[in-house]
């Protein structure tokens, strides 16, 4: 255990000088004596000086304080003891429920599974959300991104997915809150508690008010816990809200470390940092990790380097659109922009595939006709186009659905719709079985039977 002393402090970046023969390795954890602060080595500057990033507040630190090298990377508790607990980036409990009592700790920097260890699969994961199951179905052991700008419903969608999948899935889940609102973390905890699934979820929070070091590493902390469950042969769910804040923390750290910025001011190592995280989120022959990641899209621009880098790693992308949210259709998923590798007749079957493509065709055609309708009105359309527009408007409304986690706001009970009912409903609308029903009947209902019942009351 070698010791050094602080020689410079610039915000969250601290330079520590060690004797030249015992300079700590990159990613080693250092402890500041007399303070609770942990530092992580990022660079070796030469002459025994290392540049570190603080995993916590640097208030009260000063030059000359003694720092001890722990000789290992940051390690966090793993295993069953973490379930039902809220932890910070270092694995310390922050739920005031006593120590974690873990049997094992694991370093947060682990190599990704080798190519030979990885396993693929084509099993579908039913979510109970119509638009997702129809147009961008999830794969078990796959990676899903929820893309959206500010305030279009990423967190609500994620909470609904967690509720539906965790309730039905009955396996273990890990939730990593990366640079999000503390209020949402609190809501999430109570939501899990009320749904009686808290004893199957490990929660790791590094919220908006934390220093950049915490936000940069908290995703790795959550992932390390998920990897342990996977290696024990479980199918794990990993939820990350929000992966963009992980990138942003990397940008802040990169600037503080004095690296040259790249496009739009992002860190030059953006693709590598994203790859290091994403390559570890994978299924092996022991068990699977299915991950759902919320991705904030700055200024609704999907070509921004951060969301664009994330796209490459995902199996399914759920794009939330402000235009659809402005119509009052929630979940505001854009069925034309959202994609999935599972949308293949060999995987999901012909009926599902044809229905999904039929829905997309009708909505795309309606989008093209909107300009004509705006200029000339509906009367100028051919009879076929009038019929298509009527069906498109019904489909658009039928893609909406009341959520369980939003009952408090909407006042209407949540609905879980099975994949079979989803396909039956949409294929019925496409065939014209429900042309006689008013379009309002399709808004905010679960299955097609509820739409028929609602039509009787209109």
UniProtKB/Swiss-Prot annotation:
GO terms for cellular component: plasma membrane; proton-transporting ATP synthase complex. It is a peripheral membrane protein. It catalyses: ATP + H2O + 4 H(+)(in) = ADP + phosphate + 5 H(+)(out). Keywords: ATP synthesis, ATP-binding, Cell inner membrane, Cell membrane, CF(1), Hydrogen ion transport, Ion transport, Membrane, Nucleotide-binding, Translocase, Transport. InterPro entries: AAA+_ATPase (IPR003593), ATP-synt_VA_C (IPR055190), ATP_synth_F1_bsu (IPR005722), ATPase_a/bsu_AS (IPR020003), ATPase_alpha/beta_chains (IPR050053), ATPase_F1/V1/A1_a/bsu_N (IPR004100), ATPase_F1/V1/A1_a/bsu_N_sf (IPR036121), ATPase_F1/V1/A1_a/bsu_nucl-bd (IPR000194). It is an enzyme of class 7 (translocase). ATP binds at residues 148-155. GO terms for molecular function: ATP binding; ATP hydrolysis activity; proton-transporting ATP synthase activity, rotational mechanism. It is found in: Cell inner membrane. Its EC number is 7.1.2.2. Belongs to the ATPase alpha/beta chains family. F-type ATPases have 2 components, CF(1) - the catalytic core - and CF(0) - the membrane proton channel. CF(1) has five subunits: alpha(3), beta(3), gamma(1), delta(1), epsilon(1). CF(0) has three main subunits: a(1), b(2) and c(9-12). The alpha and beta chains form an alternating ring which encloses part of the gamma chain. CF(1) is attached to CF(0) by a central stalk formed by the gamma and epsilon chains, while a peripheral stalk is formed by the delta and b chains. Produces ATP from ADP in the presence of a proton gradient across the membrane. The catalytic sites are hosted primarily by the beta subunits. This is ATP synthase subunit beta. It comes from Pseudomonas putida (strain GB-1).
């Amino acid at each position: 255990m070698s010791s050094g002393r602080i020689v410079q402090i610039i915000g969250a970046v601290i330079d520590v000088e060690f004797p030249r023969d015992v300079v700590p390795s990159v990613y080693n954890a250092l402890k500041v004596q007399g303070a609770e602060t942990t530092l992580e080595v990022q660079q070796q500057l030469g002459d025994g000086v290392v540049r570190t990033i603080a995993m916590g507040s640097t208030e009260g630190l000063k030059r000359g304080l003694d720092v001890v090298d722990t000789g290992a990377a940051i390690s966090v508790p793993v295993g069953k003891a973490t379930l039902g607990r809220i932890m910070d980036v270092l694995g310390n409990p922050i739920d005031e429920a006593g120590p974690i009592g873990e049997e094992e700790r694991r370093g947060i920097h682990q190599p990704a599974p080798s190519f030979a260890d990885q396993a693929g699969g084509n099993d579908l994961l039913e979510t109970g959300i119509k638009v997702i199951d129809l147009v961008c179905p999830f794969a078990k052991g796959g990676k899903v991104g929820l893309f959206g700008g500010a305030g279009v419903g990423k967190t609500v969608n994620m909470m609904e997915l967690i509720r539906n999948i965790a309730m039905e899935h009955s396996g273990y889940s890990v939730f990593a809150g990366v640079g999000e609102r503390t209020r949402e973390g609190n809501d999430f905890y109570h939501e899990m508690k009320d749904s009686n699934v808290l004893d199957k979820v490990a929660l790791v929070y590094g919220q908006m008010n934390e220093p950049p070091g915490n936000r940069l590493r908290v995703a790795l902390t959550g992932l390390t816990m998920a990897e342990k469950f996977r290696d024990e042969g479980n199918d794990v769910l990993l939820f990350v809200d929000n992966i963009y804040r992980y990138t942003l923390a990397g940008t802040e750290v990169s600037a503080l470390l004095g690296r040259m910025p790249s496009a739009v001011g992002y860190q030059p190592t953006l693709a590598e940092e994203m790859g290091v995280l994403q390559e570890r989120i994978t299924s092996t022959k022991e068990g699977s990790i299915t991950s759902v990641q919320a991705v904030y899209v700055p200024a609704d621009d999907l070509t921004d380097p951060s969301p664009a880098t994330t796209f490459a790693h995902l199996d399914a992308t759920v794009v939330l659109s402000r235009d659809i949210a402005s119509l009052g259709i929630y979940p505001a998923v854009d069925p034309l922009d959202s994609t999935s590798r599972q949308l293949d007749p060999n995987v999901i079957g012909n009926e599902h595939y044809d229905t999904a493509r039929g829905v997309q065709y009708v909505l795309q055609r309606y989008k093209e006709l909107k300009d004509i309708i705006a200029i000339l009105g509906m009367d100028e359309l051919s009879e076929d186009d009038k019929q298509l527009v009527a069906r498109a408007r019904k489909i658009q409304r039928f893609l909406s659905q009341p959520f369980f986690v939003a009952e408090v706001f909407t006042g209407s009970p949540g609905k879980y719709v099975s994949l079979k009912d989803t396909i039956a409903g949409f294929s019925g609308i496409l065939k014209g079985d429900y042309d006689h029903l008013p379009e309002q009947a399709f808004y905010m209902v679960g299955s097609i039977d509820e739409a028929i019942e609602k039509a009787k009351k209109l």
